[in-house]
Amino acid sequence: SRGLGDVYKRQQKVKSQYEENPYPRWRFIRFFREYKISIKDAINYEITPNRINTNVNNKQLKVLIAGCGTGKQILQALKYENSVITAIDLSLSSLAYAKRKLDELGIHNVELVQMDILEIGLLGKSFDIIECGGVLHHMDNPSRGLELLLGVLKKNGFLKLGLYSELARKEIVTARNYI
């Protein structure tokens, strides 16, 4: 059984990695333009050929990006009509990079917060949409991270989750071994 000290050590190791090497580093986004799309249309586009039929009205949508890194993912979330975005990350260096890039693009309506997913309840908010890609697998207990995210997801909300897998990375590993 692993103790809290082990969990803390892993958190610190991940935090240290991204403090030293904010990820992903990006200089510009080719053809970036802010456009708006309804959440229903955005989700239907992403899950094609499947479809959702929801009555998302014109209420303001609260969006959480859990593990926003250097902010590139934030640009994609800006497409949601009538939305307010909160983006969290463990790494202050990554958040500083995100802030700098968003400022360069004239984007000032995103709340950036340094926070571990394990502390997500401290925000005191619930969200209509939660995006978390490439993050949970870094946690000592990914299931606990998912449970906490689901705890701040509103009823009938949407969770966009991305995990790394050995199968999905097989070609990358093969290419690296070849090089």
Report residues per predicted region.
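Short, small-residue-biased leader/transition segments that mark boundaries at the very start
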Residues: 3-8
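Conserved alpha-helix/loop element of class I SAM-dependent methyltransferases that forms part
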Residues: 20, 25, 30-61, 76
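Conserved SAM-binding loop of SAM-dependent methyltransferases across substrates and taxa
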Residues: 70-82
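Conserved SAM/SAH-binding beta-strand->alpha-helix loop
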Residues: 91
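Conserved SAM-binding strand-loop segment of SAM-dependent methyltransferases
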Residues: 106-118
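A short acidic, Gly/Pro-enriched loop at the edge of an enzyme's catalytic core
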Residues: 120-130
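A short glycine-rich, Lys/Arg-flanked "PGG" loop and its adjoining helix->strand segment in the class I
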Residues: 143-155
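Conserved class I S-adenosyl-L-methionine
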Residues: 158-179
